[in-house]
Design a protein with these regions (language model features):
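N-terminal targeting/tethering segments
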Residues: 27-142
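Peptidyl-prolyl cis-trans isomerase
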Residues: 212-254, 289
Length: 365
């Protein structure tokens, strides 16, 4: 069976949306079909497809190359738990879309609504997208005015609700709860790397010599010498690290040994690992800057926990149903999307935003 890959350059001047190039053999879909229900509210396939294609374009444009693959091949990769990468991403997209609707349904509880200016901006954005793109392009991504407007309404409400849903958490954090210590450590590696990046493991004799160097450093630093100076003399580098008992990097045994030290200036024993040897010196029992940053992190964690808890509560109180047969019509493998910009796509910007279509042939059994 033969098919053609359609290319449609999609242009938008709105920052919330992305310019896209769509490729594939996707046919028209019923954008009014119900892909899911959240409480009493239906999610249309048009809104779901537009949101999915926007996200798909980001993955294919920015991540496929980093993963050393093509957009097509990326979606068929195994994501574990008997899922392809496409299955996994689509599951996340559907959950995120449901969350948008849940948040919108509770916006009135927080006195959140769209302003006249926001509604006007959304309408203008949808109209501009509609005017700038061909029917072929809009068909591929469901880029129609009603679907774009609904999508932008949802993301705008979600943005305005974000802070509201995080308000009211306890922002008091004690030094004891957030305490961060500081150390300097030296890592004596059992491998060397040449200028070409090739690694070579030391011989047993060389490892013994390295262990002697590590012990010399530990002894001299314990006697009062500066760890950075001694490390440099031995051809090594002393690294700075702030940590607490829950830290795991660069090595859990090093963290545990340093955390057990009672006084600033104390030195750990040699921490031997499969890859080398660590020696650490405690430099501060309470690093002020790191502790204050940890306090901010703890407060932000509390805000996030409250946000997640609210969403979970709303989910539990709401009937949610996904119509899989409809959702399956959104297929990433056969229909690709690539983010483009007007600066790099002359065809898209010619004539005030017209879009171009072309065809690349492909075959499938």
């Amino acid at each position: 069976m033969m098919y053609f890959r359609r290319k449609a350059a999609v242009l938008t001047a709105v920052g919330a949306l992305a310019a896209m190039t769509a490729t594939g053999c996707s046919g028209s879909i019923d954008t009014d079909a119900v892909v899911a229900t959240v409480g009493e509210e239906d999610i249309s396939l048009g809104v779901a497809n537009f949101y999915a294609r926007m996200t798909q374009g980001q993955y294919e444009t920015y991540y496929a190359g980093m993963m050393g693959t093509t957009g097509e091949a990326m979606w068929t990769q195994d994501a574990g738990e008997d899922q392809t990468y496409e299955d996994s991403v689509k599951d996340g997209l559907m959950e995120s879309l449901q969350n948008m609707y849940l948040i919108s349904q509770h916006a009135a509880d927080y006195d959140v609504s769209l302003t006249d200016d926001e509604e006007k901006a959304i309408a203008e954005a949808a109209e501009q997208f509609d005017a700038d793109n061909t029917d072929t392009a809009k068909e591929t991504v469901s880029g129609y005015k009603k679907d774009i407007e609904k999508y932008l309404e949802l993301v705008t409400i979600q943005s305005k609700m974000d802070g509201k849903m995080r308000e009211g958490v306890d922002e008091e954090v004690s030094d004891e709860e957030a305490a961060q210590k500081a150390m300097k450590y030296v890592y004596f590696s059992y491998t060397t790397t040449d200028d070409s990046g090739n690694s070579t493991e030391l011989t047993d004799e060389e490892k013994d010599e390295l262990k002697s160097d590590a012990q010399e450093l530990a002894d001299r630093v314990a006697a009062g010498e500066d760890i950075s100076t001694v490390a440099e003399e031995l051809g090594q580098t002393a690294n700075d690290l702030t940590f607490d008992s829950e830290s795991t990097s660069p090595n859990e045994d090093l963290i545990a040994a340093a955390d057990a030290l009672e006084s600033e200036g104390d030195v750990t024993d040699l921490i031997e690992t499969d890859g080398g040897i660590y020696v650490g010196q405690l430099t501060s029992l309470l690093d002020r800057d790191a502790t204050d940053q940890k306090k901010e992190s703890i407060v932000e964690e509390r805000r996030q926990e409250q946000y997640d808890s609210l969403l979970e509560e709303w989910r539990n109180d709401t009937d949610i149903e996904v119509h899989e047969r409809v959702w399956n019509k959104v297929d990433f493998e056969d229909t690709g999307v690539t983010i483009i910009t007007s600066e790099t796509d002359e065809t898209a910007t010619d004539g005030g935003g017209s879009s171009d279509t072309s065809e690349d042939s492909g075959a499938a059994e």
